Design a protein with these regions (language model features):
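Conserved class I S-adenosyl-L-methionine
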Residues: 1-44, 57-58, 80, 158-164
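C-terminal alpha-helical "lid/dimerization" subdomain adjacent to the S-adenosyl-L-methionine
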Residues: 8, 25-27, 129, 142-201
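Class I SAM-dependent methyltransferase SAM/SAH-binding core
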Residues: 49-101
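Short beta->alpha hinge that forms the Motif I/post-I loop of the SAM-binding pocket
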Residues: 73-75, 123, 146
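A short acidic, Gly/Pro-enriched loop at the edge of an enzyme's catalytic core
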Residues: 100-112
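A short SAM/SAH-binding and catalytic strip from SAM-dependent methyltransferases
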Residues: 111-123
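A short glycine-rich, Lys/Arg-flanked "PGG" loop and its adjoining helix->strand segment in the class I
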Residues: 125-137
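C-terminal lobe and adjacent flexible extensions of AdoMet/dcAdoMet transferase-like proteins
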Residues: 201-208
């Protein structure tokens, strides 16, 4: 059972941050992700679910024809995403929902996309199980996440700092999604790291 108290705390945290989030993230994201957010959006096909859509920073990068659903636990973030969707003329269905218990039918989407969200979801394995459940056979899982570095000393430093980042920001610095993606039945098609291995992108599929 996932931690509903932590989910409520996350919602309150991001409700407070919603108005300032984009200004704070603009410079950080350019350094952290480069063009990887656009890369992720360009891999999406068909009916696409974006987990923890936040303020909708990916919206401008989706290709025409994508049928988009975005979920987030924070109403404040969703309100900003709605304004961004209107500004870009991007149709999107926005839902207040938890990635650990998706309000979608089995095998109902073609793509599940997550950018910098598995680090804060309390039970990341449950989120991946839910992604697998709602994906159609052959559907795509697209992840861009900050992760534990594959460089030994940096990875160790992340482990040492992680208790503080979790306590004060609900941010897990040293998670390793790739083994969990494989363990949950996905077939990995592409994996790449940047910034000394602390950022990772993954493209995987649910077997047909």
């Amino acid at each position: 059972m996932h931690d509903q108290r932590t989910v409520r705390e996350l919602a309150r945290q991001y409700d407070r941050l919603a108005g300032q989030y984009d200004a704070a993230m603009d410079r950080i994201e350019r350094w952290l992700l480069g063009d990887w957010r656009a890369w992720a959006a360009h891999q999406a096909v068909g009916r696409t679910l974006e987990i923890a859509i936040g303020t909708g920073r990916t919206l401008p990068s989706y290709r025409p024809g994508i049928v988009l659903i975005g979920i987030d636990v924070s109403l404040g973030m969703l309100r900003v995403a709605q304004r961004r969707a209107r500004a870009y003329g991007r149709p999107v269905t926005l839902l207040r929902a938890d990635a650990q218990a998706l309000p979608l039918r089995d095998a109902s989407v073609d793509t599940v996309l997550s950018i910098l969200s598995l680090c804060t979801i309390p039970d990341d394995q449950q989120a991946l199980r839910e992604a697998y459940r709602v994906l159609r056979p052959g559907g795509r899982l697209i992840l861009v996440e900050h992760v534990r570095s594959d460089r030994r000393l940096l990875g160790l430093a992340q482990r040492l700092i992680e208790p503080l980042s979790v306590r004060f920001a609900h941010d897990h610095l040293a998670r390793e999604p790739l083994p969990m993606v494989v363990a949950n039945g996905f077939q990995v098609l592409h994996e790449q790291r940047r910034l000394a291995g602390i950022v990772q992108r993954i493209l995987a599929v649910k077997p047909s």
